Amino acid sequence: MILKKEKQKAIIVGGSIGGLSCAKALILAGWDVVVLEKSHAPPMGSPTGAGLGLDTLAQEIIQSWLSQPELLHRVTLPLTIDQNLATDGAKKVSWVLTRDENLNFRVAHWTDLHGLLYNALPNEIFQWGHLYLSSCISDDKTFVKVKAKVLQTDEIVEVDGDLLVAADGSRSSVRQCLLPDVKLRYSGYCAWRGVLDFSECENSETIVGIRKAYPDLGNCLYMDLGSRTHSTLTELMYKRLNWIWFVNQPEPELKGNSVTMKVSNDMIRTMHREADKVWVPELAGLVKETKDPFVNIIYDCDPVEQIVWDRVVLIGEAAHPTTPHCGRSTNMSILDAAVLGKCLDKWWGADENNSNLQSALEEYQSIRLPVTSKQVLHSRKVGRIKQGLRLLPDRQPFDPKAANSPEDWQDLQQRNIPHFADVPSILDSMFCST
């Protein structure tokens, strides 16, 4: 008879959606987990964050993790349609370039999805206000030791575990230690972002106008392509509108470890004036009415060749920082977590040597790395197309006003990303009916 080993312990660095997804997947695989997160408490209300799209596979994975799968639909709206528009800023008119009525995404606010996953986990696994400092693997490679600072007291604590999971985002401290020569690549543009709560002004001129200009809001991912710029627009649950506007500019000076940049009132006023020039009046009005817009600096990273080391594994943006144009960031993190959990469940048996763990990590890497590498590069390409940046020296930048054949816009649709609908076979058991 083969007996399962006693529970192993994973230390997860990062308490965002990727970290929470890993926690759930590993608990279901029979592991104990502890989550180290530098934030002092779980996010409440609406912190700096915005809308995110969930593809069909990510939806199914999340629902398999919930005791009440229907809860996902209570905090999301459907995105059945993926529509790309060309906009002439001078004439203030838009027209359809592409329309896919079978996207089958759902859209959530970051806070709502985070709360859904957080409430599906035991409270005791979280160590809030803990800043990751360093880690090392024991000489005999039987455990990993993590050092963290308790931010409230400045105390340095050590945590031992069998596996370190780095889910600490695109500027991952864990990745920096393992791959010091790997640097983030500035995309050439930043993104203004905002969420407008219209729950108390549903009949305002702004909301009536935006619904007339974008009649499929509540079921559509709108992309507006202007001259060397583009924007996205979606409706979120609880009467909120989420917009993003990508602007070509030199790389800003980054302060701290966040890709979110503080903005001044002067910057906001300048942005409002530009919106009037670039977009149709309805979209410009929405942008101007949104309180507390913020700026994300857009980075990605050339694909790496390795995301596992002995007892350390990278997931999500820590493994493959990506631009946001193909809706991959959250979806890749969720799929990374699900695959890692299933690989550990498959390989962690009765054998007392480390071969089981290594086999699990190697299979995780072999499944995910080829896919994420292609998707990161495709998203980079799509971003450069939409921003009117050169792809090749002999290829002219994309001009949406001059696009008049399917070859001109085939890369714009979400479903044309590599491996768009692929489901790793190791996940088959998650969706088998009982």
Please describe what each predicted stretch is.
Residues 22, 45, 137-138, 174-177, ...:
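Short glycine-/acidic-enriched loop or helix-start segments at secondary-structure transitions
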Residues 73, 83, 104, 108, ...:
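Conserved FAD-binding catalytic core of PHBH/FMO-like flavoproteins
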Residues 2-8, 28, 72-74, 83-93, ...:
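C-terminal helical "tail/cap" subdomain of flavin- and related membrane-associated enzymes
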Residues 46-47, 65-66, 75-76, 177-178, ...:
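Short, flexible helix/strand-to-coil boundary loops that buttress conserved ligand/catalytic motifs
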Residues 9, 32, 240-243:
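Residues at the starts of beta-strands that form the adenosine-phosphate
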Residues 42-120, 129-130, 386-387, 392-393, ...:
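Active-site-adjacent segment of FAD-dependent monooxygenases/related oxidoreductases
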Residues 1-12, 17-18, 38, 42-57:
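Accessory recognition modules or surfaces
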Residues 12-32, 36-39, 165-168, 192, ...:
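Conserved mid-domain beta->alpha element of the FAD-binding
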